[in-house]
């Protein structure tokens, strides 16, 4: 009887550990959604209910994130920072979430600015923006809107955006990169709502 109980308790604890591999980070979901709304031009400002809610899943460990990705796609996740798999959830590595929180608190480095842009990138996919190059461009540019929304001054907001662009230029695969002059032109002529594909 004791052995059976121990096995049962072990199974329950194992199931709980599996279920608690991540948390839904409400702050990151709220900030991303507010940033995307702020990133649209005032005359065309998208109504709040047109910016779809995203549930940001932050994993407690790198291994938990990698295991979930590998189970879903059957491919290694060692080079994956974050992803969107349809629905209303976006999936972020532990370090990505931590760096976004540092960005929100005012630490703007290449890593934290990139992490904030990566969060916005995945939430843009949730909004229906599909093309990776355009999504990255829009996310990098929206870092400025997010920094201003978080009450950082113009100089800091511009710097954070430039750091996000620098990270993309330096570290992202070619299919995610758009030349900065082309990206700036795209952002002057359009905003993310022009690039969304809403599946009915």
List the predicted regions and their residue ranges.
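Alpha-helix initiation and capping sites
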Residues: 25, 29, 86, 109-113, ...
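Short acidic, glycine/tyrosine-flanked loop/strand segments centered on an H-E-D-like triad
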Residues: 92-119
């Amino acid at each position: 009887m004791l052995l059976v109980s121990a096995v049962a308790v072990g199974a329950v604890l194992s199931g709980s550990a599996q279920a608690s591999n991540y948390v839904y980070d409400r702050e990151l979901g709220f900030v991303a959604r507010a940033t995307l709304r702020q990133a649209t031009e005032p005359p065309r400002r998208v109504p709040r209910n047109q910016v779809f809610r995203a549930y940001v899943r932050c994993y407690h460990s790198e291994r938990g994130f990698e295991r979930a990705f590998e189970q879903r796609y059957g491919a290694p996740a060692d080079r994956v920072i974050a992803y969107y798999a349809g629905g209303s959830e976006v999936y972020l590595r532990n370090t990505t979430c931590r760096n976004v929180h540092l960005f929100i608190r005012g630490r703007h480095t290449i890593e934290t600015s990139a992490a904030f842009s990566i969060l916005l990138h995945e939430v843009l996919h949730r909004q229906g923006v599909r093309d990776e190059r355009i999504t990255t461009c829009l996310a990098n540019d929206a870092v400025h809107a997010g920094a201003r929304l978080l009450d950082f001054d113009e100089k800091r907001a511009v710097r954070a955006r430039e750091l996000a662009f620098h990270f993309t230029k330096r570290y992202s695969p070619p299919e995610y990169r758009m030349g900065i002059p082309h990206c700036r032109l795209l952002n002057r002529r359009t905003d993310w709502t022009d690039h969304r594909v809403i599946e009915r």
